[in-house]
């Protein structure tokens, strides 16, 4: 297409309120994120009702800041992209209703975006020349997916968690060893001081050894049992060793399955996405194992790994180019699956 397509994107699926202006799916003019971490920290996790109320408070300001930083006005926008699932229903509704109101008032197309597709699309921002096909590992607090991206907007789910998401397991273990919220970065930090081989925590074993699914509930239970036994015996607990050993089990599972997926699909490229993609151990292990297996491993910069609207703007662009827009009847779908519309 001759004309640049400017998309105003909005993300409010959990506890970040974000707005961004993205051009042609890959160029970010602005990406404003208002985080609620400090608010939810005292509760030990995200409180949905509190998150929704905070989204309502800040969304107008966040959108205005995104336009100001991009040095454009509403009349320069060509379309509105917005997350409509998966996520917390109350949080999703705030961003969705705001986007629908803008779409109606400005008479601009509305493009509903799957949050998981947004995470995958963060790699198109980071790597301007990236094109399908490739394998993508989406790993965050609420989701763990192993996906084969055949073409823009076309996904085949190769594996997913059967219980806890990887990031959810991190949060629970962080809480158990007294590190607080958010758990992922804190476990990652303290793990650097520990011995990853100190404790042998088991990985899930499936009867079907061909599956690329994940399971972290057994690992989580094993860590909790270890901590309980130590506590009952009144023995000292080396938090760094626990964190490092737990992290090694999680990371090796994620990396091994991802490399197996590449062999299955005969591709040599893995894109990693989602909040856990910022994890230093995951990045280092992928870099090492990718090199050994002659597989290119791509990571977005950390700001694009967290929930943000720039990734939603990128995904919205590729949906729009495939002829997909949404009506003003679009509703929030908290349990939206990858590939569903």
Swiss-Prot record:
GO terms for cellular component: cytoplasm. Keywords: Acyltransferase, Cytoplasm, Iron, Metal-binding, Transferase, tRNA processing. It comes from Clostridium kluyveri (strain ATCC 8527 / DSM 555 / NBRC 12016 / NCIMB 10680 / K1). The gene is tsaD. It comes from the Bacteria. GO terms for molecular function: iron ion binding; N(6)-L-threonylcarbamoyladenine synthase activity. Substrate binds at residues 138-142, 171, 184, 188, 279. Disulfide bonds: none annotated. It is found in: Cytoplasm. This is tRNA N6-adenosine threonylcarbamoyltransferase. InterPro entries: ATPase_NBD (IPR043129), Gcp-like_dom (IPR000905), KAE1/TsaD (IPR017861), Peptidase_M22_CS (IPR017860), TsaD (IPR022450). Binds 1 Fe(2+) ion per subunit. Its EC number is 2.3.1.234. HAMAP family: TsaD. Belongs to the KAE1 / TsaD family. GO terms for biological process: tRNA threonylcarbamoyladenosine modification. Its cofactor is Fe(2+). Its main location: cytoplasm. It catalyses: L-threonylcarbamoyladenylate + adenosine(37) in tRNA = N(6)-L-threonylcarbamoyladenosine(37) in tRNA + AMP + H(+). Fe cation binds at residues 115, 119, 307. Pfam families: TsaD (PF00814). Required for the formation of a threonylcarbamoyl group on adenosine at position 37 (t(6)A37) in tRNAs that read codons beginning with adenine. Is involved in the transfer of the threonylcarbamoyl moiety of threonylcarbamoyl-AMP (TC-AMP) to the N6 group of A37, together with TsaE and TsaB. TsaD likely plays a direct catalytic role in this reaction.
